[in-house]
Swiss-Prot record:
Region entry Disordered, spans: 40-60
Additional free-text comment from the UniProt record: Missing about 170 C-terminal residues compared to orthologs.
Organism: Escherichia coli (strain K12)
Protein name: Protein YmjC
InterPro entries linked: NAD(P)-bd_dom_sf
Amino acid sequence: MKNVLILGAGGQIARHVINQLADKQTIKQTLFARQPAKIHKPYPTNKMQTTSGKKVIQDR
C-alpha cells in the first residue's frame, strides 16, 4: 500500500485528486489542511486520515 500526503486538502484541486485516489485500493491518503472543517466530505475514512496545521505546530 502506498501512502499519499495531500497538502491543502480543503481546496478545489485537492477535492478532485482525493476523489480520484479514493477509488484506488492500494493508496492510503493523509489529508493536510489548515482548517480541517473545510475538507469536503463524504470520503471513505478507512483509507484516509486528516490532520491540521495547528496540530503539527503544537507537536513541535
